[in-house]
Amino acid sequence: MSTWLLPENIADVLPSEARKIEELRRRLLDRFRSYGYEMVMPPLLEYLESLLTSGGNELRLRTFKLVDQVSGRTLGLRADMTPQVARIDAHLLNRQGVTRLCYAGPVLHTRPRGLHASREQLQIGAEIYGHAGLEADQEIQQLMLDALHLTGLKKIRLDLCHAGVLAALFARDAAAAERGEALYEALAGKDVPRLNELTDDLGADTRAALRALPRLYGDASVLDDARRLLPALPEIARALDDLAHLAAQVKDAEVAIDLADLRGYAYHSGAMFAAYVDGVPNAVAHGGRYDHVGQAYGRARPATGFSLDLREIARISPVEARGAAILAPWKQDDALRAAVGALRDAGEVVIQALPGHDHVLDEFACDRALVERDGAWVIEPR
């Protein structure tokens, strides 16, 4: 085997892509800070049980596992940063009231989520802890859309769902709850034949409700259909009211209701949302409410948040990260060194051409040059 080969669905990030990713990362983190979010940096490696406190079997299967040579315990390479941030809020910060946290870092998956998906993603996201009201859901939803607009994406569609609908159906039908994982997979994949097979022997009301969910997709008027087709349970009524409220607050994106879009259902407890753009089959960002995630760390708090993969966003973003630069010669000249240093201190990119290498790669847009005129170093257009 060639020593330069990488594992399947793992790739290096080359300069032009890395520069674009870093430009987007800085934009998003600066925007999160403008909303009052504090940065945290959880470790890439943790004890396995700490990483798998939520997320169900799907997260367990996606997590790389290895043995710690120090303690002998099983470790995991994180596949999702959300449980880690919940641990920080619950166990380390232990604050009262509202806490806003954000993060950015790599996550690793044992299997790719799609045909061309990378198994190493650069996850960036934001979370609010400590407020159970829809105001927190609305802020996170707006921050996610704001972040996507900052990346230059257009014609964003926001799909809304609610974990409370399925939870209410399972709570009143034990047989349905027992096959919950299989039902979730059938609904998420909109596999109607499999869904029909799984619901054949359930109670008539539960069967009809579960089979209706894949059809409850469209604009906000779908909520009226849902009220008519789903059981008149208080939990379902509240869930539909929540979705109606959140949908009405969105002013800068198309809104769709999809009551079968149950990505991450295993740890969500309320409103869920995913963002889509034209030409990309999978969601470019997703999030929702997960009030019980911190329970495993001794302190369950209301929580909602979102995340996205910066590598995927950089691939589809029209943002141009090739900034202007200044080309300077390489000389043993104190005045030149001082001029270059002053320009860099002022935020300029200055590239000094090494002897015999006067050309500059297209990676840099050197639209100006630092030249010597009458004993002084000045900037001129190129």
Curated annotation (Swiss-Prot):
Pathway: Amino-acid biosynthesis; L-histidine biosynthesis; L-histidine from 5-phospho-alpha-D-ribose 1-diphosphate: step 1/9. GO terms for molecular function: histidine-tRNA ligase activity. It comes from the Bacteria. Gene3D superfamilies: Bira Bifunctional Protein, Domain 2. One of its GO terms (biological process) is histidyl-tRNA aminoacylation. One of its GO terms (cellular component) is cytoplasm. Keywords: Amino-acid biosynthesis, Cytoplasm, Histidine biosynthesis. It is found in: Cytoplasm. InterPro entries: aa-tRNA-synth_II/BPL/LPL, HisRS-like_core, HisRS/HisZ, HisZ. Its main location: cytoplasm. SUPFAM superfamilies: Class II aaRS and biotin synthetases. This function is generally fulfilled by the C-terminal part of HisG, which is missing in some bacteria such as this one. Belongs to the class-II aminoacyl-tRNA synthetase family. HisZ subfamily. PANTHER family: HISTIDINE--TRNA LIGASE, MITOCHONDRIAL-RELATED, HISTIDYL-TRNA SYNTHETASE. Required for the first step of histidine biosynthesis. May allow the feedback regulation of ATP phosphoribosyltransferase activity by histidine. Heteromultimer composed of HisG and HisZ subunits. This is ATP phosphoribosyltransferase regulatory subunit. The lineage of its organism: Bacteria, Pseudomonadati, Pseudomonadota, Betaproteobacteria, Burkholderiales.
